[in-house]
Amino acid sequence: MPAQAFYEMDGQRLVPSGLTRGPWDPGAQHAGPPSALIARALERCEPRDGMEIGRITIEILRPVPLAPLKLRAEVVRPGRSVELLEASLSGPDGVLMRARAWRVASSAAGPPPERPAAGPADGAERPFFPTGQEIGYHTAMEYRFMRGAFLEPGPATVWMRMRVALVEGEDPTPLQRVMVAADSGNGVSAALDWRTHLFINTDLSVHLLRVPETEWVCLEAETLLGSNGLADTALWDERGRIGRAAQTLLVRPRA
């Protein structure tokens, strides 16, 4: 039976399915699902009513293998209205990702959100990169492009939705849905041809105005190139703007 989730629990470990596989290496995960696991650990770390994650920054220390994972999270700076949290994701050979997050007191003081110009029903499916992999992250997600495509270098606007659960038997939270999708900013807006160049992110920083209220998350992404690379992504749900994501990119020709 095909996997119905990115991960399943095995005691204190999370075991990845083939749906976590990324486009760069068949033995490594796309960073979206493990980023969402970190969000899950942060959400479960001493949660408090009236507080929301306002920012998560994840450092990707090395590729995440398709192997059992463990997570740790703690509050390192407690506070009445602002808290700093840290989390780590580890595999058989040590720590793979480290993260810091600000949890802040929520407020309804802002104006009504600006609505996106068009929703996922107006988008189109586009072919994924020719990885040769029949199963992976790309088959676990739905894509509806409003602008651009995987194989068309340049800015892109795409709606994304999870086809499967993050963890078997659990409904994904709004924050987890954002993190699964946000790591795709560099992929959907590639400035160079995937067949000739690598553009791998070393981090992911997500700033949130609010968590999404719909299953679909929209990435309005652009990749900028200098001596390094930067993927800059505006994040939306079907009600309006929810935040922004940024990724530092390692850019180089394929060997």
Listing of model-derived features with the role each one plays in the protein:
Residues 1-255:
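Terminal targeting signals and extreme-terminal segments of soluble enzymes
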